[in-house]
Design a protein with these regions (language model features):
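Membrane-interface anchor segments at the N-terminal boundary of transmembrane helices
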Residues: 143-144, 362-363, 371-437
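Membrane-proximal stem/loop segments at transmembrane-domain junctions that anchor or position
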Residues: 286-399
Length: 487
């Protein structure tokens, strides 16, 4: 193992590792079709997966070459290099906006209607609703909201450029990261949806974690806590990401015996901000608890899976499930109607009419039945755990099917984590990967539907962590020297 690691430290060893990685993922990606790159792929006469694969490989090769140069001397940037990356991000965003126009998601329109009417409910996070409502007053036709989203994307590009410059990476690496963000995220960053803001905040937080490896300074802390605060304000499940990341940062601070109170205070502040946004703010505004049954879709689908596949289920328990969740004939019909729409077969699809949907869909039928559904799950699922876990396994398809970009991004990240493990680096080198683990848990266990947007952070983090892993792998001594004696 030491001999193999020594070879990987060399320039050609790293190139060989990148080529081997490319060959493996080429075999996975050749039959794939990637939605955002399909048009470009058709022009080239190849599949979308091949185009995406070569983009990722080019970023990997550029990072490896940049690393080799950075290990000998710091790469000079032109004056205002970060501004060049900001201009690049803004140019890409405006071009896409000009070509596609202002595109709004159903979530955005629903929140905007709440903000304009003043009749708040908890279907969408109130912090997001109040934000877009305030921006809506500044400009017509959602122009202010689009401008704010573009500003956050440009900010993410700017902090990425600042980090690349501090690491001594060439300007080309930062430009490559910014250029890959839009296509890897299926252009969703230019759509008015809270997941676009969420993804930009995730990139900013990841930059902060990457910067922490070299130095714990104001830039690292500002990007880390700022990005994390944006996450918890936009989605309640981001509290899991904040908790996992905060625990990792606090553990590293304790091992280094430096800045523990400041880290604890910062993480506590972020978590309190999330709790205030999703618990205290609805109470203060008197928002109706109209959260539809989608938040119960996963436990309810587990119960449906037990009814369909577990022949040993006692008749009285089967009757209880069907009485609370859905009549058995309807349940079985929907289970077999659209198996490819994981997580949506009981929500929107397969119903005969609007009246049938309103009567039986989880969205309407389970609204306000949280206690009953969760109590039934706690009582019955432990005895049928093997069958009940099938929906969770099905939800991982988004992360393991190479025809989807998140699976490709996850493969890149696993490869990079393996390289860092070979280098036997300290724990703080793996901090940027912690939020991704929490995001995988969210996609698998918390997300109620099979939607690409839930995995956008995985895709957005991939090109950034390409450069990070390369810089850390090839030039770890600089970071170790600055933090010598602090764990």
């Amino acid at each position: 193992m030491p001999l193999f690691a020594d070879r990987l430290r060399s320039r050609w060893g790293m190139h060989l590792a990148a080529v081997l990685w490319a060959a493996v993922w080429a075999l996975c990606c050749i039959p794939a079709e990637s939605g955002p790159l399909r048009a470009a792929a058709e022009v080239c006469g190849v599949s979308g997966g091949v185009v995406l694969f070569w983009l990722l490989w080019a970023a990997m090769a550029a990072a490896v070459e940049a690393l080799h140069r950075a290990s000998r001397s710091r790469s000079p940037w032109p004056r205002g290099g970060e501004l060049l990356l900001c201009a690049e991000a803004l140019g890409f965003f405006l071009l896409l906006w000009w070509v596609k126009g202002t595109r709004c998601s159903a979530d955005f329109l629903g929140s905007l209607e709440q903000a304009r009417s003043g009749a708040y409910n908890t279907i969408q996070p109130l912090s997001y609703t109040l934000l877009i409502g305030a921006l809506d007053k500044l400009g017509p036709n959602s122009a202010a909201n689009m401008a704010a989203q573009a500003g956050l994307f440009v900010t993410a590009a700017g902090v990425t450029g600042r980090w690349c410059r501090r690491e001594g990476l060439p300007l080309l690496c930062g430009a490559g990261v910014v250029a890959l963000l839009l296509p890897l995220c299926q252009w969703a960053i230019a759509v008015l949806v809270k997941d676009a803001l969420y993804t930009c905040c995730f990139v900013i937080m990841t930059v902060g974690l990457c910067s922490l490896y070299r130095r714990d300074d104001a830039f690292s802390r500002t990007t880390l806590y700022g990005g994390m605060a944006g996450l918890v304000l936009l989605r309640p499940d981001a509290l899991l990401i904040a908790a996992v990341t905060g625990l990792g940062v606090l553990t590293v601070a304790r091992r280094r015996r430096s800045g523990v109170p400041a880290v604890a205070l910062g993480i506590s502040g972020v978590l309190f901000l999330g709790v205030a946004a999703h618990v205290l703010l609805p109470l203060a505004l008197g928002a109706r608890d109209d959260a539809c049954g989608t938040r119960l879709a996963m436990p309810a689908e587990m119960l449906c899976e037990v009814v369909v596949h577990d022949a040993d289920l006692p008749p009285q328990e089967r009757e209880r499930i069907c009485r609370l969740i859905m009549p058995e004939p309807v349940l079985r019909r929907h289970h077999d109607s659209a198996p490819e729409w994981i997580g949506e077969r009981y929500l929107w699809r397969g119903f005969d009419s609007a009246a049938d949907l309103r009567q039986h869909s989880f969205v309407f039928h389970l609204a306000g039945r949280d206690r009953e559904v969760l109590a039934l799950c706690a009582e019955l699922l432990p005895a049928h755990a093997g069958t009940a876990l099938r929906p969770l396994i099905a939800h991982t398809r988004l992360l393991r099917d190479p025809s989807y970009t998140p699976a490709l991004a996850l493969g890149v990240l696993l490869f990079l984590a393996g390289l860092l493990l070979l280098r036997r680096l300290p724990l703080r080198a793996f901090l940027p990967f912690l939020p991704l683990l929490a995001n995988i848990v969210i996609v698998t266990c918390v997300a109620t539907t099979y939607e690409y947007r839930y995995a956008l952070p995985l895709c957005a983090a991939a090109p950034l962590l390409l450069c990070y892993a390369g810089a850390v792998f090839m030039t770890p001594e600089a970071g170790e020297g600055q933090n010598r004696g602090r764990g």
